[in-house]
Curated annotation (Swiss-Prot):
SUPFAM superfamilies: Zn2/Cys6 DNA-binding domain. This is Uncharacterized transcriptional regulatory protein C757.04. Pfam families: Fungal_trans, Zn_clus. It is found in: Cytoplasm; Nucleus. The keyword Amino-acid biosynthesis does not apply. Keywords: Cytoplasm, DNA-binding, Metal-binding, Nucleus, Transcription, Transcription regulation, Zinc. The keyword Zinc applies. It comes from Schizosaccharomyces pombe (strain 972 / ATCC 24843) (Fission yeast). GO terms for biological process: DNA-templated transcription; regulation of transcription by RNA polymerase II. Residues 556-580 have a biased composition (Polar residues). GO terms for cellular component: cytosol; nucleus.
């Protein structure tokens, strides 16, 4: 007698509908001397596949639409429609050998474990055989870095997290500082090269010259320590370090190097599989990564995702990280610890005003980044279908994205929807950064269409949308300047000012006298903003020169005295000379003569020869006039 338990009752018990013990032979058949046979086919599990059901629903919808059209057609039209019907593409039922389960298909995933927290990821198409030993492991020694608690380093860290955190969300403040002060994660999230990278950014905005002059030294030290650590040794802090250095270079006007470093960071992150949910990874029936480490990886990925979209958008270049490749959940907030208040800005007001958290800011940045990426792909990509059609299709797509941005703003919960009164007081720094990003996207989307009179969304023209966003940007920057000063500005402020100036330059030729007065005031405001930001970011300093070079080309037809606010500084920032600003009216020739005394533009760099090529953004692909000219040629 076999003791193997079957999944189904024997045929005799099933026929008589009595209980069977599912052994062979079963006790009932053995008792009554009947033949005990089993049918191994389990028809209970024979169900239609999910794809078959979806296809059937789709075909049913098409059939219903066809019948309704047929009903409303004239006799001749019905005959033509019936002749066109073909049933050769009908759906077929999958046979018994097809998919057995409705669950997701499990693809092979390979994890190369480097240490208790670092895992390299290889997907199902990987050509690497991970059963082979990793020859690089023995050549690397584990680090034993002890954090330096010098007052200068501490001050740089405080400046970074107080004023720049909304721009560097891929650095998880709680995990970094808990490792820096308490070695909570055994120093895993606080490596030497990351500390120096953060200090380079923090030192650049210090009012103390003894600290600010070390900014470039911190940058060089970070890069050197990163090379010693090993670029072939993928690590989360190396991803964060590369992104910090990339942002630093972009802020100093070295856009090509910043682009390369950020791209290297994203590739290293993908090597770590940081876009995937590590909670599904098991090694020897144990989680490959702890829950706390998983939460930190979430923040690093989504912060990197926002950085990728922002950098790609302001440069008008393709992005690397795709939403469709990510399975990792949203970011969670780690517990705070004593002393963290020193690294926050306006802690009392911030906490009492709203429950808006850093995780909320990350979620909003991610949503806006998705919209920005879609705009870049579908509106300004050289292979975009809309670019290949006439202007009406382009304007229709423009209206769609304007409406999407408006709906996103209007649907924000009351607890996180920004109000003008909140922006004026600058009491929620992260929310103000989100607001600047939102208006930056709106302006870059509508800037190539300023001369169009067509209404694109909610009875608004591209010109109206851009001017409204400029007014909001002025409100935010004024509040930040009053509360903190523009020495501590982020690149969101710098690029918002640059893009606003570009719109004002375009609007000068299509405005009334009353509008021109407002544009003059706004231009003066933004030039002063860039001048103050140039103390931290050389990008702002160079942009002023290029704005003035653009105005130089217009002096033959219109005086630029209302716009020009002279500045001067040397290229390496080691010394500066103050240009007299006592004149109430500055003649264009006087300003240009002063500017020629200083070498503010990089040598042999064609990227900085024109303002349009410098400020980046989607319109860098085609200038506004050329963009519309090509579209009109398509319609002829």
């Amino acid at each position: 007698m076999s003791h193997r338990i079957r999944h189904l009752s024997c045929l005799a018990c099933r026929r008589k509908k009595v209980k069977c013990n599912r052994q062979y032979p079963c006790t009932r058949c053995l008792k009554y001397g009947e033949a005990c046979t089993y049918d191994e086919r389990d028809n209970r599990k024979k169900r239609h596949s999910l794809s078959y059901l979806h296809s059937l629903e789709s075909q049913l919808a098409r059939l219903e639409s066809f019948i309704m059209t047929l009903k409303n057609s004239d006799p001749e039209g019905r005959d033509e429609m019936l002749k066109s019907v073909v049933f050769s593409d009908h759906l077929t039922e999958p046979n018994d050998q097809e998919v057995k389960s409705e669950g997701p298909i499990e693809y092979p995933v390979f994890l190369n474990v480097q240490d208790s927290k670092t895992v390299s990821f290889y997907g199902p198409t990987s050509a690497y055989d991970l059963s082979l030993p990793d020859i690089t492991k023995d050549n690397k020694t584990t680090w034993n870095f002890q954090a330096s608690y010098s007052p200068m380093v501490s001050e740089c860290l405080k400046l970074f997290f107080r004023y720049q955190y909304s721009q560097f969300l891929f650095v998880y403040r709680e995990s970094f500082l808990s490792d820096y002060y308490y070695n909570f994660h055994d120093g895993f999230y606080c490596t030497e090269h990351l500390i120096y990278a953060i200090c380079a950014i923090g030192a650049s905005m210090s009012d103390d010259e003894n600290i600010s002059r070390h900014s470039k030294s911190y940058y060089d030290a970070s890069w050197q320590k990163l090379l010693e650590f090993g670029l072939d040794r993928s690590h989360l802090t190396s991803v964060q370090c590369l992104l910090c250095l990339g942002y630093y270079d972009i802020g100093m006007g070295n856009t090509s190097l910043g682009w390369l470093l950020s791209g290297l960071a994203f590739r290293m992150g993908q090597d770590l599989g940081f876009q995937l949910n590590p909670e599904n990874w098991y090694i020897d029936n144990s989680p490959a990564i702890s829950s706390a480490d998983s939460d930190i990886r979430r923040r690093v990925f989504w912060g990197s995702y926002v950085a990728d979209k922002f950098i790609g958008f302001i440069m008008g270049r393709p992005t690397m990280l795709k939403r469709s490749d990510a399975s990792i959940p949203g970011s969670n907030q780690l517990p705070e610890f004593a002393g963290l208040e020193e690294f926050k800005l306006n802690v009392t007001d911030y906490m009492s005003l709203t429950d808006f958290s850093v995780c909320d800011a990350v979620a909003l940045f991610v949503d806006l980044s998705d919209i920005a990426d879609s705009i870049l792909l579908n509106m300004f990509s050289p292979t975009s279908k809309n670019r290949a059609t006439n202007i009406n299709c382009v304007l229709s797509n423009l209206g769609k994205y304007n409406l999407e941005l408006m709906n996103w703003h209007y649907k924000l919960p009351d607890t996180i929807s920004w109000r003008t009164i909140d922006l004026k007081k600058d009491r929620i720094p992260n929310l103000c950064a989100v607001s600047l990003y939102y208006h930056l996207i709106r302006i870059c989307l509508n800037r190539p269409f300023l001369s169009r009179k067509e209404v694109t969304a909610n009875d608004l023209t591209p010109k109206t949308i851009c001017t409204d966003s400029i007014n909001e940007i002025v409100t935010v920057i004024r509040a930040h300047r009053t509360a903190n000063g523009l020495r501590y500005s982020t690149l969101y402020i710098v690029y918002a000012a640059i893009v606003s100036c570009s719109v004002i330059l375009l609007l000068r030729d299509m405005c009334t006298d009353s509008e021109l007065l407002t544009l003059n005031n706004d231009m003066m405001f933004f030039i002063e903003v860039l001048k103050e930001c140039s103390q931290t970011w050389k990008l702002a300093q160079r942009s002023i020169v290029l704005i003035e070079n653009t105005l130089k080309g217009k002096t033959n037809s219109q005086s630029t005295s209302e716009f020009v606010s002279p500045i001067s500084d040397t290229e390496n920032g080691s010394s500066s000379q103050q240009v007299s600003e006592a004149k109430d009216i500055v003649e264009p020739s006087d300003v240009l003569d002063e500017l020629q005394k200083f070498d503010l533009l990089p040598e042999n760099d064609d990227n900085f020869q024109t303002f349009q090529a410098f400020y980046g953004g989607p319109p860098i692909i085609l200038s506004p006039n050329l963009y519309e000219k090509k579209l009109n040629e398509k319609t002829l």
